[in-house]
Amino acid sequence: MKVQAENAARLGRQVLGLLPPPTHRVSLTRGPEFARGVRDLLSKYAASTRPTVGSLHEALRQAPFRQPTYGDFLVYSQTFSPQEPLGTFLFSFKQEDNGSSMDMLLTPTSLFMLSGMEAAKAPQTHKVAGVWYGSGSGLADFIPNLSELMDTGEFHTLLTPVGPMVQSVHSTFVTKVTSAMKGVGLARDEPRAHVGLTLPCDMLVDLDESCPMVQRREPAGLNVTIYASLVYLRVNQRPSMALTFFQSGKGFAEVVAMIKDHFTDVIRTKYIQLRHELYINRLVFGAVCTLGTVPFDSHPVHQSLNVKGTSLPVLVFANFEAACGPWTVFL
């Protein structure tokens, strides 16, 4: 009996489905009645777009999280130049967790000083790095195994991208540095203006401008991502590394392909030099990580930092939003 009842109900639904839908009466002679009839008809099939208290409450409760996150660091004053500009990107270097309250922060200029690269790689940064982090800073003394880390391609595993600097308070021995680790940074000192990202001009490469025209015609996203790349080389038969910043609106996989193309000659030269002494710890060529994003329609501002008779041309991304990612080995 139960089966027969279900069959009868299904047959009834199938028969009703063959019938035409019910008609709707709409007055065509009276304007107010016509508007009311159309409105009633549409209300059966479409939801109202009029905001209600419930919808507003739900929108406020699920608002995107845009509160910036800041981090404070204590570093030895001799390892961090007081002339580093606001917005310079900071990297935290740590080999072991020994419970010390002191940190080690590296900047593009201090990393260039440690890298062992020749001046031709970034001539302006090379000059300023020699002034800010010369022999008197003792920067290399804090990383006694630097050469080994570069030779084995492990330096980036101890280097964590932090974010742009928004404040530095210097004293004789200890310096307090504040960084915007997530979101848009605000200066801690008055006036509390936005702090963007400041990078040396000779260390930044625009991948979208240097890529072939076929790729440049592809649709661009709403944001341009800033990347940092650290590659391991050999200069004058000694281990070295090179820090380079890239910007692109492409996807990550395509960016990695363009970075490999950018370093094609360097990759070939390195593996030719090491062809007789290659082993597994020397196979890593480089790694890349994301630093954050800027709007696609914003353009960096060219500025110049004057340092003891020389100048450092920099690019300032005013609308930079920090969103650091982990290092990814690309070769």
Swiss-Prot record:
The superkingdom of the source organism is Viruses
Q: Where in the cell is it found?
A: Virion; Host nucleus
What would you give as a GO molecular function for this chain, any one? DNA binding
Pfam families the record matches: Herpes_VP19C (PF03327)
Q: Which UniProt keywords apply?
A: Capsid protein, Host nucleus, Virion
This entry carries the following GO cellular component terms, namely: host cell nucleus; viral capsid
User: Which GO biological-process labels does this protein carry?
Assistant: viral capsid assembly
Q: Which InterPro entries match?
A: Herpes_1
What does the similarity note say?
Answer: Belongs to the herpesviridae TRX1 protein family.
Q: Which HAMAP family match?
A: HSV_TRX1
Q: Function of this protein?
A: Structural component of the T=16 icosahedral capsid. The capsid is composed of pentamers and hexamers of major capsid protein/MCP, which are linked together by heterotrimers called triplexes. These triplexes are formed by a single molecule of triplex protein 1/TRX1 and two copies of triplex protein 2/TRX2. Additionally, TRX1 is required for efficient transport of TRX2 to the nucleus, which is the site of capsid assembly.
Assembly with partners or alone = Interacts with TRX2, MCP and capsid vertex component 2/CVC2.
What is the name of the protein in this document?
Answer: Triplex capsid protein 1
**Organism of derivation:** Human herpesvirus 8 type P (isolate GK18)
> What gene name is given for the protein in this entry?
TRX1
